[in-house]
Curated annotation (Swiss-Prot):
Interacts with drpr; this is required for the recruitment of drpr and glial cells to severed axons and for the phagocytosis of axonal debris by glial cells following axon injury. It comes from the Eukaryota. It comes from Drosophila melanogaster (Fruit fly). One of its GO terms (biological process) is dorsal closure. PANTHER family: TYROSINE-PROTEIN KINASE. GO terms for cellular component: cell cortex; cytoplasm; plasma membrane. The gene is Shark. Residues 10-106, 288-403 form the SH2 domain. Residues 410-446, 476-505 are annotated as: Disordered. The active site is at D789. This is Tyrosine-protein kinase Shark.
Length: 939
């Protein structure tokens, strides 16, 4: 293979996969590589790499359309890099998840200019920088083809024209069909630079050439409007808004254009933006809003519409079919955008937030602003949808085909209502009530109706902060700054929710409706109906009923015992908690919750040894394996009835691993149920080839009596599937009961921090891990599972930048030289991680897990220091009860410590949600690649 002085000559154009295999298998060393065009996806590339005599091919996916951002399209490889040259250099420094690092390129050509992040200054660059219009014109006229080449700062001639040239050079370059939306090394596109100082005509010319008015700087989140506002270019601001640029985009630090204008002293721009009147949206909710739908119903409606669309227009691409629905899912209560892309349905939560200017809340007609992820704020859902019909940023594809809802049944006329034969009492004339919408009789007391009248539109049209509003039916919109929805409210059936214009079916609803109906004549005399329930003290009492914290935590009000509640009302507990509560008898404490354990008696005392029981005595009349399969089938299916023999056999195939397929290696830990070994699971592929998967094997001690608890926890783990959760592979029954899980090669996060603290940085590993832990806990919350033992020792590292939550009431990692926090016989209860309601009352909830999360983050930034030092558990409880909290670690920034303190609020309902914590760490401005390292949570 020939050598070349230019290390970038590894590009082989449209070389086929077969030809790449043949080239690389000619005796080259491991790590030899080439890059070629993808034959399956236009604009993508393929990295072909030789390793141990085999050629591996990795799809290199392009991000951002024509811009040069790329990543290895693999579940493990999610790092997005600017330029193919940067990507190759990244994997030349280290393997970073590939089987080997890139070593020697197979020499051919340089990659295309528009795929690189850097280059060298050429004649066109110099002429453009000096505003030499004639030289630029002659270069382009004579067929100069390097017009998209980049200089050492990654800037094309168009970038330089936006900085230094007049409109003549701009038009020359645009006539040559240069790329208008490429980013330079500073993350800026040409329109970013033009927005700083260029006149309106220059901006207009760029926009007419398809420059992206919402192009986002990957380094700081700036869009052109931010640049124009910061530099006081009012002409550019006006031109961008005329081109439908969002007026309220956010930087990575959450700053709006008017914030930047104020900081820079650009008063005229600030006042213009604050008084800007947003035009009405060019779409209406009757085109795409479906009211309350489950995820499954939305998917079915969307796919049915796409099928009908294809039947009418066979050549159409159905990607972009969408609808908006109201979700009652515990994971995301509020409005959800459901979108079809490449035959896959994706869901995006529409969040809400207040808007502040100079520390004061900006009024928005009584409702909050809406947004998706880190996208711009909008005053109504109509404006948000209209925006995403124009721009796709943040979505896989722009919104194209709205799916209309089914026609609503007509509201019955008042003429059809039976009239009383009684002579009505004398009363002053009253205006007939407005017909009730299908959702209005179940409306949240603080949320206005979905329908917006023309009069309301006129009243709210003075500025962009007072325009069309849309709030959710029944409940407030979900927001990362809000707490969770109230789950103590009774839920109606789908059939009840769908009846249009029906009268209230309960006494409480009749009471609420009575004032409106008193002036009408019905067969029932409503005028004598007692409506006190919705006025005066009655209203206050109703308010108390709904004063349950929205993050599903018990508070100081009288509640019925858990056994009298429906399963939906206690769904924020684990299913195992529900089972425990049903099995227990005894007195209930004042707030309606029975402690899961008398923890006060166990503060610093040893746990009594359990009685010895045989492992194979789970059931009196069935084999151990059948009983286990029956138990796990019931738990995983949620069916209380005894499964059939066929179902038991199916459960065996699904859950059980033959013990002879497991090979034990060394012991790596010891836990509550027994020992933990590394080992291998022997498997056969479809072709009959045998392979070995490295796993962790947890074994239940033969003398351990808690087999039912062991299997119950196993059934919970089998239902969990998330990138940030340790995966349970199966169960084996040999001489003892064994659980097979994925192996975390780096072990416990706590031990890793203790061993490698000098290598760990707060802005990299610690924030990545914190975001992944929060993401995993949010997933557990969405599955109604309370961890109850979240701590650094129970977080495992499968890679340096991948943390996973483990130990769901089962084993604990062995920490050499210390057994202080082990759940073994003679161990201690982990009081130092518990919230006050947990160690005082034995109450566990998602909010108590948030407290434990705060302590876990404190451990991380303290590099493994024990919480509260060497004091006893009793003294630690006294400190917490007196209002004291853990001090700020040296490595911890003030804004992260503030979040820790919010996790340690006395009242559970005042603590943040895991949704918020995930967003907080993933959107941290100091570490831009965090979102790519965290698994997206499904709504």
């Amino acid at each position: 293979m020939s050598r070349d002085s230019d290390p970038m000559k590894w590009y082989h154009g449209n070389l086929s996969r077969e030809a790449a295999d043949e080239l690389l298998k000619q005796g080259y060393e491991d790590g030899t590589f080439l890059v070629r065009e993808s034959s399956t996806a236009a604009g993508d590339f393929v990295l072909s790499l030789l390793c141990q005599g085999e050629v591996c091919h990795y799809q290199v996916r392009r991000h951002g359309g024509e811009d040069a951002f790329f990543s290895i399209d693999d579940k493990v490889q999610t790092k997005i890099l600017h330029g193919l040259d940067t990507l190759v250099d990244y994997y030349q420094q280290a393997a970073n998840g590939l089987p080997t690092k890139l070593t020697v390129p197979l020499i051919r050509d340089l990659p295309p200019h528009n795929t690189r992040s850097h280059g060298v200054t050429n004649l066109l660059h110099r002429a453009t920088s000096k505003n030499e219009s004639k030289v630029v014109f002659e270069l382009l006229k004579c067929g100069y083809r390097n017009f998209d080449a980049k200089n050492q700062d990654g800037q094309t001639a168009l970038h330089l024209a936006a900085l230094h040239s007049d409109e003549d050079i701009l038009k020359h370059l645009l006539n040559a069909k240069v790329q208008v939306n490429s980013s330079d090394s500073f993350g800026c596109q040409p329109l970013h630079y033009a927005a700083r100082s260029k006149p309106a005509s220059f901006i207009r010319t760029l926009i007419s050439a398809q420059a992206n008015v919402q192009g986002r700087n990957i380094d700081n989140g700036y869009v052109p409007l931010h640049e124009a506002a910061k530099h006081g270019n009012l002409e550019a601001v006006q031109e961008l808004l005329l081109a439908e640029a969002p007026p309220l985009p956010r930087t990575s630090s959450g700053e709006f254009p008017f914030d930047l204008a104020k900081e820079a002293g650009q008063t005229a721009v600030e006042e213009f933006l604050l008084n800007y009147k947003l035009p009405p949206a060019n779409t209406t909710r009757d085109q795409w809003y479906h009211g309350t739908l489950t995820r499954e119903e939305a998917v079915a409606i969307l796919k049915k519409h796409a099928k009908e669309l294809l039947a009418k227009q066979p050549e159409v691409d159905t990607s972009g079919c969408f609808l908006v629905r109201y979700s009652e899912s515990p994971a995301a209560s509020g409005l959800v955008l459901t979108l079809l892309c490449d035959q896959v349905v994706k869901n995006f939560r529409i969040s809400q937030a207040d808007l502040y200017q100079n520390g004061n809340k900006v009024q928005s007609g009584g409702s909050k602003f809406l947004y998706i992820d880190d996208g711009p704020y909008w005053p109504s859902v109509e404006h948000l949808i209209a925006h995403f019909m124009r721009f796709s940023y943040g979505l896989p594809v722009s919104l194209k085909y709205p799916v209309p809802p089914q026609p609503k049944p007509e509201v019955p006329s008042f003429a059809t209502i039976p009239r009383s034969n009684m002579k009505p009492k004398a009363a002053s004339p009253a205006t007939p009530p407005t017909p009730v919408s299908p959702h209005s009789h179940h409306q949240h007391p603080h949320v206005p109706a979905l329908t917006i009248t023309k009069k309301k539109q006129k009243e709210n049209s003075s500025s962009m902060f007072n325009t069309l509003r849309l709030t959710s039916p029944k409940k407030a919109l979900f927001d990362m700054n809000s707490l969770r929805k109230n789950k103590s409210k009774g839920k109606r059936s789908d059939s009840e929710s769908s009846v249009s214009g029906s009268l209230a079916g309960t006494e409480q609803e009749l009471q609420a409706a009575a004032p409106m109906l008193k002036s009408l004549s019905f067969s029932t005399e409503f005028s004598t109906f007692n409506a006190d329930g919705v006025t005066g003290s009655g209203a206050a009492a109703a308010g108390e009923v709904y004063n349950v914290p929205r993050n599903n935590t018990p508070i100081e009000i009288d509640l019925p015992p858990i056994a009298q509640k429906t399963e939906a009302e206690v769904e924020y507990f684990t299913k195992s908690d529900v089972a425990i509560e049903r099995e227990r008898a005894g007195q209930w404490i004042g707030n309606g919750y029975q402690p899961t354990m008398d923890v006060l008696s166990l503060l610093d005392q040893q746990i009594k040894a359990p009685a010895v029981a045989r492992l194979n005595s789970l059931g009196p009349n069935a084999s151990t394996e059948s009983e286990m399969a029956s138990y796990l089938h019931r738990k995983c299916s949620g069916t209380p009835s005894t499964p059939s023999a066929t179902e038991v056999e199916a459960a065996k195939l699904r859950f059980f691993i033959e013990p002879e397929k497991l090979v034990l290696d060394r012991e790596i830990g010891h836990g509550e149920f027994g020992s933990v070994h590394s080992g291998w699971l022997l498997r056969k592929s479809g072709a009959g080839e045998e392979s070995r998967l490295e796993v962790a094997i947890k074994m239940l001690s033969d003398e351990h009596s808690n087999k039912q608890e062991f299997l119950r926890e196993a059934s919970v783990m089998m239902r969990l599937e998330h990138k940030c959760i340790v995966r349970l592979i199966g169960i084996a029954k040999g001489e003892m009961l064994m659980m097979v899980q994925e192996l975390a090669p780096l072990g416990s996060m706590l031990q890793y921090i203790l061993d490698h603290g000098h290598e760990i940085t707060a802005n990299a590993e610690l924030k990545v891990w914190a975001s992944q832990i929060a993401c995993g806990m949010h997933y557990l919350e969405s599955q109604h599972f309370v961890h109850r033992d979240l701590a650094a020792r129970n977080i495992l590292l499968t890679a340096r930048h991948q943390a996973k939550i483990s130990d769901f009431g089962m084993s604990r990692s062995l920490r050499p030289g210390s057994t202080e926090y082990q759940f073994t016989q003679g161990g201690r209860w982990p009081i130092r991680w518990y919230a006050p309601e947990s160690f005082n009352l034995g109450i566990f909830s998602h909010a108590s897990d948030v407290w434990s999360f705060g302590v876990t983050i404190w451990e991380m930034f303290s590099l493994g220091a024990p919480p509260y030092g060497e004091i006893s558990n009793v003294d630690a409880i006294k400190l917490v009860d007196s209002g004291e909290r853990l001090p700020q670690p040296n490595l911890c920034p003030a804004y992260i410590y503030a979040v820790m303190q919010s996790c340690w609020k006395e009242r559970p309902k005042d603590r943040p949600t895991f949704v918020y914590l995930t967003e907080f760490f993933a959107r941290d401005p100091d570490y831009q690649n965090l979102p790519e390292l965290v698994q997206t949570v499904h709504i």
